[in-house]
Amino acid sequence: LRHEYDYGKTELGVIPTYKGRVSSTGLSKDGWITGIRHVRTLKNNSAFEIVVGQLSNAQASEAFAIGNEDEYVEVEYSARMGEQHSYELSVEKILQGSFVRGEYRYRLNESDTVFFELVQRTDESAAKVVFGSSGEFAATFSGNSYPIEYFAYYSYINSVFGPRAELIEDFLGTGHGGSLEFSGVASRQHNLEWFVRLDVVDSVSRLLAGVKISFRTRN
């Protein structure tokens, strides 16, 4: 159930996690939260968000039973400062762990953005650090120019960071790691895109390649 207002929105029931790709914290292992989210849009391009629920419990009646092992609580403030700067600050309670998270993005130009994220576990001496860049460039094939998107980052996750690390969308393991991805349009007519991605964490590597199809109608 979702209700949108002029000043924000409220979602109730089984809701998506909405974590951004840049912060690499998409909680796709379980994928959904059973609970409630409220977003309040504030002045000066800022917003306040609160989420309360269960990360993996399929029983809706347990969505507000704070204290269970799969509880999920998040309070976040996000803001944009002009056209170049934006940031997020949040506190989280996930799977018996407490965390403070900060993310900063800087838009270098029309095509490129650099970012930095720090997630500090407050009940343990452990952290997750990410920094990198995303954007778009043009490649020429047979005299034609094709836009290609890229996404690259370095990350470090402490070995005692806890189960929250395993919920990260592209989690391979703790330690030093990095990721490089390229993607582009394969067919505009069929809403088809291609992608190639390489993930490396210490001695573990993973290569992903494929196509994505969108069922959303283009304007």
Walk through the language-model features, giving the residues of each.
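Short, solvent-exposed loop/turn segments at conserved positions within beta-propeller repeat blades
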Residues: 29-31, 66-70
